[in-house]
Every structure is written in C-alpha cells, then in structure tokens.
From Swiss-Prot:
CDD domains: M20_peptT. The gene is pepT. Binds 2 Zn(2+) ions per subunit. Its cofactor is Zn(2+). GO terms for molecular function: metallopeptidase activity; tripeptide aminopeptidase activity; zinc ion binding. This is Peptidase T. HAMAP family: Aminopeptidase_M20.
Length: 413
C-alpha cells in the first residue's frame, strides 16, 4: 500500500470505511444505529492504546471524547477537533475501497466490477489529482470519506504527536460523534464537558475548504389524509391524497430546487413522497443562507397548506415544520480569530483557503450556537454520499499538515 508521510493514515481510513455506520433517520435512539455504538467503542480502544487521556463515551450524546494533554509550560487556549462517524443515506453495506496509485489525471476509473466508472467528462475534478493516490468505491456503495477521512486524520494526528514529543502544543480535545448525517448528532453536545475554547469540524471536501457560513435549515413533514372510494362513483366524493400532494408541490417555485440553484440561492427540496389515494406523505428540506428569506420560505409553505385545506373544505393536510440548524456565520461573529487561525495555517503551507458559503450544514453549526465557535475544515472527500465518492491520500495528508500547523500557531507566544 502507498507509503504515506503519516504512517497508518491510509490503512486507518480503509479500515474505518469498511465498518458500516449508516445512521437511521427513523430511529429515536442515540446513536440512531447500534453499529455506530460498536464503531465508537472500537475507536475508544484505539485512542486508549495511543495513550490519550480521559477517553470516554458521553452517556447522553454518545460522543467519543478524549484529551491530548498539553506539553507546554504556559497557558494555551484549548483547541477542539471534531468529526462524525456515521455515513449518509446510501448503501453502506460491504464497503470495498479501491486504491488507485499514481492516477494519471485523464483516464476514467472503473469502479470494481459494477459497470460504473468515474469519468473525466462527468467528474472533471479528477484532473486535479494527477500523480496522486485515490481511494474510490467499487461502485456498489458509498465510500464514507464523509466523514471517516476526518476521523482518520484526527486519530493520525494524535498518533503523530505521540511519536513527536518535540512538537509543543496546548491541550487538545477530540470529539467523534454520531448522527451528523441525519441532523441530530450535535443536538445534545455538551460544550462545558468537552472543555475546549474553540474547535473545528474536520468534515469538509476538497483541499483548502474552510467553511464559516452554512445554510439555515428546516424540515417539513406533510401528511395528507385522502378519501378513497370506487372510481366509478368518485365524482365530488374522492379526495386523492397523491393528487393533493402534487398540487402542493406545483405551488412551490419551480426554480427554487437544489438542481436549479447555486451559491447563496435557497431552495425547497422534496426528497420523500410516498402515498396512496387514502394517504400521502411528503418530506421537504428548506434551506437558505439569509435568515429573513429562510423565515419567508417557511411561511410560504404554511400558507400553501392553509389555502389547500381551505379549498378542500376541511383540514386534511397536517404540517410538522421544525428548524434543524442555523447559519454558522451568525454564531461566529466576534470569533473571527478562529477562522483566521485556520486560514493562516493553510497560507503558511502554501494552500489557498477556499472560503465560501457552504450549501449544507455541519455539526459545527449547532455546536457554535451552543457556545463553542466551530468552523469547518477540509477532509478531502469528493462526490460525497454516492457510489462516485473518492478521496486523495495526499489531500488527507495535507489535512493533517494543516492541523499540525494550527496547533503550532496556537502555541506561539
């Protein structure tokens, strides 16, 4: 296997990727899947073996917590490093990573025997990785670089610091959490117990990503109660719940969809629609960077439901609308130095920081609103949440480089 400047990094990542930890948005437990619990226990044993202190799984939020003690004789702000262990809502059984060494930057990459390929035409980002080692899927599952790349990078950092005591640093807190992909992982994060002054999630994408702004996010769950009667006698009697759902969807702006928007444009995303004539259920994601536009989107959906119920003559449509997280940038006001530290670390290493409003969210969004400023750093993954996911080993190495540089800068007088 490819030699790495950080021994064990690639091996760790592949080992972690093979463990199924898909979170379950229908579960009411924490973590949502027992497989996450098993993996967290596996990682706890690894951190204990590396000599980290106070290794434990938090009894309420199931975060795996650990401390790298300071080796410097003066006060230094405590840095936190966070990642999540669950993977997204895509097949994660029997993940079989493929290692492509010295990729030429121009060829298509077959994904095992699945018949799928990573093609230059469809994924031009591949051109950036000429001469690098890529880890891909075999075409049947996702890879899980989101966020097991981040997990591997943090644990590799811990191992490297153990082997290099000459690197002076303050106390570092590590937190590896569940259920980020279903939006609940950080809901019960205990900032006081974690004990950091500032933190970073290592959960971003390609080299240089530094995210200090996210969407505001809400979810809308809509249930429609129809009335099913024989089609031969349906006139003025039948209420087709499926058709009501279609009518509702058609009242939303056609261009306010993920596939029609970019940059700071918000959207409504209908990502589940199940139904019969008798009952239908629609689930929407509502997203916008601008708080006022976010609130307006929610009110527009409420108004559509009210109008449809009025037209039906009775309340056949119920709406459960709730916020999921808020724009990270608002919570980071007054803590710009946390972003600047990461930016300077990248610049000192010759990496161009790529700072832009991310079209998504991170656990750092929630954690920042709980009082711990937590921007997001790149972990390396491309095409996440899909069979076309891949990651560059060299980008993962540079993620560790950046963490080491940040630690050094934080320890400077």
């Amino acid at each position: 296997m490819t030699d790495s400047k950080y021994p064990g990094l690639l091996e760790r990542f592949i080992k972690y990727a093979k463990v199924e930890t898909r979170s379950d948005d229908q579960s009411k437990t924490v973590p949502s899947s027992p497989k996450e619990t098993a993996f967290l226990k596996q990682l706890a044993a690894e951190l204990t073996e590396l000599g980290l202190e106070n290794v434990r799984i938090h009894p309420q939020n199931s975060y795996l917590l650990a401390t790298i003690p300071a080796n410097i004789d003066r006060p230094v702000p405590v840095m936190g490093l966070l990642a999540h262990v669950d993977t997204a809502d895509f097949n994660a059984e029997n993940v079989n990573p493929q290692v492509v060494e010295d990729y030429d930057g121009q060829s298509d990459i077959p994904l095992g025997d699945s018949g799928y390929k990573l093609t230059i035409d469809e994924f031009p980002s591949l051109k950036k990785y000429a001469g690098q080692t890529l880890v891909t899927t075999d075409g049947t599952t996702l890879l899980g670089a989101d966020d097991k790349a981040g997990v591997a990078e943090i644990i590799t950092l811990a191992a490297y610091l153990k082997e290099h005591p000459e690197i002076k640093h303050g106390q570092i807190q590590i937190g590896l959490g569940p259920d980020e992909e279903i939006g609940t992982g950080a809901d019960h994060f205990d900032v006081k117990d974690f004990g950091a002054d500032f933190a970073y999630t290592i959960d971003g994408g390609p080299l240089g990503e530094l995210e200090d702004e996210t969407f505001n996010a809400a979810q809308a769950e809509i249930d429609i109660q129809g009335k099913d009667v024989h089609t031969g006698t349906a006139k003025d009697t039948m209420v087709n719940a499926i058709q009501v759902g279609i009518d509702l969807q058609n009242q939303l702006p056609v261009h306010d969809r993920p596939e029609k928007t970019a940059d700071r444009e918000g959207f409504y995303h209908l990502y589940k629609f199940d139904g019969t004539v008798d009952h239908a259920r629609l689930v929407y994601l509502i997203r916008d960077h601008d708080k006022k536009l976010f609130e307006a989107r929610k009110e527009a959906l409420r108004a559509i439901v009210r109008d449809l119920n009025a037209n039906l003559g009775e309340d056949r449509i119920s709406l459960n609308l709730y916020d999921q997280y808020y724009n990270l940038k608002d919570a980071l006001k007054g803590h710009e130095d946390v972003v600047e530290l990461a930016k300077k670390a990248m610049e000192d290493l010759g990496i161009k920081p790529d700072i832009y409003p991310v079209r998504g969210g991170t656990d750092g969004s929630t954690i920042s609103y709980l009082g711990l400023p937590t921007p997001n750093l790149f972990a390396g993954g491309e095409n996440m949440h899909s069979r076309f996911e891949y990651v560059s080993v060299q980008t993962m190495e540079k993620a560790v480089d950046v963490l080491l540089k940040m630690i050094a800068l934080n320890a400077e007088e």
